[in-house]
A protein has these predicted regions:
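Active-site bordering "gate/hinge" segments
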Residues: 1-172
């Protein structure tokens, strides 16, 4: 998801706006909306723009390895989780949702006081939501995992088995 968040002081009030549409026409709309929002604020509390700190810790949330994960690898992991879950016990009847997803992006924060910070990030996650039925009762189980850097750290077998055990534990 990409977007731009904007805030500014107008008539001594802080106005906010946001858009996911990033083009030339959005700039004026962001400013106008922030001004309108500032005018509608009824509180008298003053807000200030943060000038920034002298030093920021480096946070590394980017992994080239995650960037290079292919869609085929993600699909393979999702199908594997589904198959494992369905083999845990005969009462596990259906996988409702199963996914393996990667994302990457960049964040920037800047203001008129000189603050300008940018960082890139990647992450990958896998999860499964399933249903078990013992003939009289139905229960669901869910499990997922997430990592910033190492897809290998996600144990798809463990995720599938935990979700199945959760559903089974809710039966009878």
């Amino acid at each position: 998801q990409k977007g731009i968040s904007f805030r500014g002081i107008y008539k001594e009030k802080m106005g906010y706006s946001y858009t996911e549409k990033i083009d030339e026409t959005s700039i004026e709309l962001l400013v106008v909306e922030a001004m309108e929002n500032a005018e509608s604020i009824e509180m008298d509390d003053k807000e200030e723009l943060y000038a920034g700190a002298q030093h920021y810790e480096t946070v590394n949330q980017y992994s080239e390895a995650v960037t290079n994960i292919s869609p085929q690898e993600l699909i393979k992991v999702a199908f594997s989780m589904e198959n494992i879950a369905l083999q845990v016990h005969p009462f596990v009847k259906r996988v409702i949702q199963c996914s393996a997803v990667k994302s990457e992006g960049e964040r920037s924060i800047a203001n008129t006081k000189g603050l300008h910070c940018t960082s890139k990030y990647t992450n990958v996650s896998a999860g499964i939501y399933l249903m078990a039925n013992d003939g009289t009762q139905t229960a669901t189980g869910y499990e997922s995992d997430f990592t910033w850097k190492d897809f290998v750290a996600i144990d798809s077998k463990e995720i599938a088995e935990k979700a199945a055990r959760e559903a089974l534990s809710k039966l009878g």
